[in-house]
Design a protein with these regions (language model features):
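Transmembrane helix-boundary motif of multi-pass solute transporters/channels
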Residues: 42, 46-151, 261, 270, ...
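Membrane-interface loop-to-helix entry segments
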Residues: 169-232, 265, 288-291, 415-426, ...
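C-terminal membrane-solvent junction of multi-pass transporters and transport-like membrane proteins
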Residues: 376-388, 426-491
């Protein structure tokens, strides 16, 4: 423990190979959530198709989606001031780094596809099947990419100055989701190439657009016609006004932190597809920190540009269109309202592509463990050597979330309801890391998270889980219905998973006089799967 207390948060731990023992010395084989083989570097039927640059884009495109353009408006509306908004982004960045360190240690220790599914199964082998069931329920119920499909549709229609009906808005969002599912399901290499191109275009566009705002304000190429009013004594960055209007309600601060953490969601995206990554451990240790620094820099510059160019009240009332307001004020109605919103739509589309790519692999891993119906079909990579079954499992809930809820608060609600169960699993993974360190002190760890970062992550997860139930001063959250609805829905999903697990693995076997056993099978395409079969007692 003493060795780790002086290590920087994202520094790889040195490895003393001659001091290592059997990594499974302290854990009986019958108590492993995964077999020994399943914790070794795996190879997907698709092969090692992801290079370092592809892995970097997979992470950056997942992290930098619509959040940098869509969430600042709702965050400012919740917290009320420039200073508190930037403070929330800073705290969220630090917390994201803590979570990333935990994911990197797990990923280097268990370098195979599946992400949190693998880590929870390995860490919590008892009660049997519980961790796997909860991950499966979350993947099916909350494993969607609806939010960025919604942003894509909203910014595309805004760019063409169309006042859409609700049906048109939803149809465009569903069209994007469907097209991406078809590309990833039928054309593996083409899909990877497209998402790589979109990723680099996205980084260039976001950097250029954000830096343009600073350039216009700082160098005044158009004189005082743009942004001059921002340099009065009541300028948003003047110290006497920077905290004006701050709302320190922990309930609202927590929802804002959820949104910031959502904007950083996906820093561990490469953990979900390590079977397809070349040199997975080395790539993981360099790609993730590089993506974190990239996202942090772009987010900081973008937020400063908003506050310098767009009046605070307009930001608060902008909803998800604050990015469009920035570009409209800088470049006028034609360019600002057309080209730049289209660039934001491209950013959202790139995010949907990489999220779909990664979550399809997670769903396929869940199916291979026998925790989804029709597991043979969903586990197979035929006929296109792609996880088509996993894509279908991802497509259905995303389609329903886009199509069924009414417009209005749906974007904020989706962000919140996705974030809450994620904090529950993040807490379980972080506590589990400490348990594994104690249980297996001699296990090979190519990367080791800084222990204060691990404890900070635990404390913040607990605080964020409690915060939604603390009433805001006016008993109003960031939606027009009950402020804690998202926490109740998120908790209900987890409780439903526990109930389903109990009925499926405990109650029904007790009534039927059988027990569930794992049986290994190999599909025609060479994929190894686990079937859960009934065995009479």
């Amino acid at each position: 423990m003493a060795d780790t207390e002086h290590q920087p948060l994202l520094e790889a731990a040195s490895i003393q190979y001659d001091s290592l023992r059997d990594p499974y010395l302290n854990l009986p084989p019958d108590e492993l959530g995964l077999s020994i083989q399943s914790t070794l570097p795996g190879t997907a039927p698709e092969g090692k198709t992801l290079t370092w640059s592809s892995a970097y884009i997979l992470v950056v495109s997942r992290v930098i989606g619509s959040g940098v353009f869509a969430t600042p408006g709702s965050i400012v509306k919740s917290v009320g001031s420039v200073g508190l908004t930037l403070l929330v982004w800073l705290v969220g960045t630090i917390l994201a780094a803590c979570g990333l360190a935990v994911s990197m240690e797990y990923g280097c220790m268990l370098p195979r596809s599946g992400g949190e599914k693998v880590y929870l199964e390995y860490t919590y082998p008892r009660p049997r099947f519980l961790a796997s069931t909860l991950i499966a329920v979350q993947a099916v119920v909350l494993g969607f990419t609806a939010s960025n499909c919604i942003i894509f549709a909203k910014y595309t229609l805004f760019a063409f100055d169309i006042e859409p009906t609700e049906a048109q808005h939803k149809a465009l969002a569903v069209g994007l989701l469907t097209a991406i599912t078809i590309v990833h399901g039928c054309f593996l290499k083409t899909g990877i190439w497209i998402q790589n191109v979109l990723g680099w275009v996205k980084i260039f566009l976001i950097a250029a657009m954000s830096l343009t705002g600073l350039w216009v304000i700082l160098f005044r190429p158009y004189g005082d016609s743009i942004g001059a009013s921002q340099f009065r004594p009541d300028h948003p960055f003047a110290w006497d006004t920077v905290w004006e209007g701050s709302n320190w309600s922990w309930s609202l601060l927590s929802t804002s932190l959820f949104k910031v953490l959502y904007s950083y969601a996906g820093l561990n995206n490469v953990n979900n597809v390590l079977n397809e990554v070349q040199n997975p451990v080395r790539t993981l240790k360099t790609v993730c920190p590089a993506a974190l620094f990239t996202a942090c820099g772009l987010y900081l510059v973008a937020n400063v540009s908003y506050f310098l160019v767009v009046p605070l009240e307009e930001i608060k009332n902008s909803g998800e269109l604050v990015g469009a307001l920035l570009f409209e004020r800088l470049f006028g109605d034609h360019i600002g309202r057309t080209l730049f919103p289209l660039a934001i739509a491209i950013s959202a589309a790139g995010n949907v592509m990489v999220v779909t790519f990664a979550l399809a692999r997670v769903n396929q891993e869940i199916a291979r463990q026998g925790f989804l119906p029709w597991s043979k079909v969903l586990s197979s990579s035929r006929p296109f050597q792609t996880p088509l079954g996993g894509l279908i499992v991802h497509y259905v809930p995303s389609l329903l979330v886009i199509s069924l809820p009414p417009q209005g608060d749906v974007y904020n609600f989706i962000l919140d309801v996705e974030g809450y169960p994620g904090q529950i699993f993040a807490l379980a993974v972080t506590v589990g890391l400490l348990l594994v360190r104690r249980r297996e002190p001699f296990r090979l760890r190519p990367f080791k998270a800084w222990i204060p970062a691990v404890w900070l992550r635990i404390v913040v997860c607990l605080a964020l889980l409690v915060a939604p139930f603390i009433p805001p001063p006016d008993r109003k959250g960031d939606v027009h219905f009950f402020y804690a609805t998202y926490a109740i829905v998120g908790t209900s999903v987890v409780l439903f998973g526990i109930l389903y697990w109990y009925v499926w693995t405990r109650l029904l076997p007790r009534w039927g006089g059988y027990k569930l056993e794992e049986e290994v099978d190999v599909l025609d395409d060479g994929t190894s799967i686990t079937k859960l079969v009934r065995s009479n007692e």
